[in-house]
């Protein structure tokens, strides 16, 4: 039986809640890896916690800046030995992505650099409001070309775009956020699919799950996920 890769979003600044999420998502059927974003990383003790964290984790910083600043941001996490994935914004451009990938090879070769395309909280209307004239599919495909060209290891996109990306760029690690178990609320997400749709139908390499796993009873939610997939 295939062991699917799930990144669980530890979207909190409370270390005790993080410990509970990690403890309660532990199981033998799925590979569940904690994902830490801006809220935890910027919190008072978040970074210190990650310095001492003994297991592999995903650092979701979505870096987006000039090449030099972005490169030094990677250099500054050299001490986070168990970081295995980090996100950067494709909007930062080809030179920034190249600089980050180059620095990552020096800092920690084990880190996979993932390029974030259009956030799953956005839709075509949202993009139009910010001045974009192309639709989501067109933008993501354009960004995918740059991500591949930059040497980055993977791409973050919704399941809708992932179908095309998987066919066109087979070597890219495809990660899909915007995942909800059947019946769960969309909350602030716009482009949402179920774990089954993403992992089984679209065959993405991994998914990100937040509230569908971490809200209310975590252990029960993990079992719901297992029953849903298998």
Task: Tell me the role of every PLM-derived stretch.
Residues 12-14, 38-42, 63-65, 90-94, ...:
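Active-site-proximal loop/turn and secondary-structure-junction residues that shape catalytic pockets
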Residues 4-10, 32-36, 57-61, 84-88, ...:
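Hydrophobic faces of well-ordered beta-strands that scaffold small-molecule active sites
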Residues 22-29, 47-54, 76-80, 101-108, ...:
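Acidic (Asp/Glu)-rich catalytic clusters
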Residues 10-53, 61, 67-70, 159, ...:
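Conserved alpha/beta-domain cores
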Residues 2-3, 69-154, 158-162, 166, ...:
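Conserved anion-binding
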Residues 19-23, 47-50, 74, 94-101, ...:
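Generic structural signal for well-ordered alpha-helices
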Residues 36, 40, 44, 157-206:
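A C-terminal functional module that forms or caps the active site or interfaces directly
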Residues 84-93, 181, 191-221:
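Glycine-rich phosphate-binding active-site loops on the catalytic face of alpha/beta enzymes
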